[in-house]
């Protein structure tokens, strides 16, 4: 476990995996350096954990989170807002493997969050008879904050083989104490260079949003990774990032008038004081 007030903990983790990770093959054929089991903690009162040693695209993070919360599984919403991070998995070639039209990703995050366990109609579409985990967890945080069941699961074993990319960030749990909301994410598969910086910021944003609509302050965001890996073709980029000095973390502003998680818009969220080094490009392993 590593705790830090900025991204030093993350940088220590990628340095450790670069230097000590086990070389392994992987599904994509790219090859990785991997380490099993890691944890990072961020006190959200100390700043919003958007990495500064490389520029991270907050617009993509925000719209992807909105997309999950909508229960949407088609990339049109993302593409309409200029977000391309799911394009590689939404091609006609990828979706045809599962009998779906181009752009339709199937029962991934949004579906599992908002309609878990839904049945299918005769036309293959999902009925709206599943569990709305987002609504339920918010109701439980408000009515039963001491519950140890404040959990949302994106992992459905019955459907994990029916999508091109099964959920990597699989389960998150909330914890309420002293008027503060904390969140822990378990990520089964952690692409440390490209994916994890997005995941840290996304779930930190979600924690802020849910805390606000539940009249709570923010506590910690805790990231727990299973297979934590660096792709072999990201090592040069990791070296470049590790050569940079981190800046202070920015602050997050949310429109205080918003009291329903589904009412947030892009203009209701603002990252203030974000100073970063330039972005570092790296290939995506599909």
Curated annotation (Swiss-Prot):
Pathway: Pyrimidine metabolism; dTTP biosynthesis. InterPro entries: Thymidate_synth/dCMP_Mease, Thymidate_synth/dCMP_Mease_dom, Thymidate_synth/dCMP_Mease_sf, Thymidylate_synthase, Thymidylate_synthase_AS. DUMP binds at residues 27, 148-149, 188-191, 199, 229-231. CDD domains: TS_Pyrimidine_HMase (cd00351). One of its GO terms (cellular component) is cytosol. PROSITE patterns: THYMIDYLATE_SYNTHASE. It holds the Pfam family Thymidylat_synt. GO terms for biological process: dTMP biosynthetic process; dTTP biosynthetic process; methylation. Gene3D superfamilies: Thymidylate synthase/dCMP hydroxymethylase domain (3.30.572.10). It comes from the Bacteria. It catalyses: dUMP + (6R)-5,10-methylene-5,6,7,8-tetrahydrofolate = 7,8-dihydrofolate + dTMP. GO terms for molecular function: thymidylate synthase activity. The active site is at 168 (nucleophile). Belongs to the thymidylate synthase family. Bacterial-type ThyA subfamily. Homodimer. This is Thymidylate synthase. It comes from Psychrobacter sp. (strain PRwf-1).
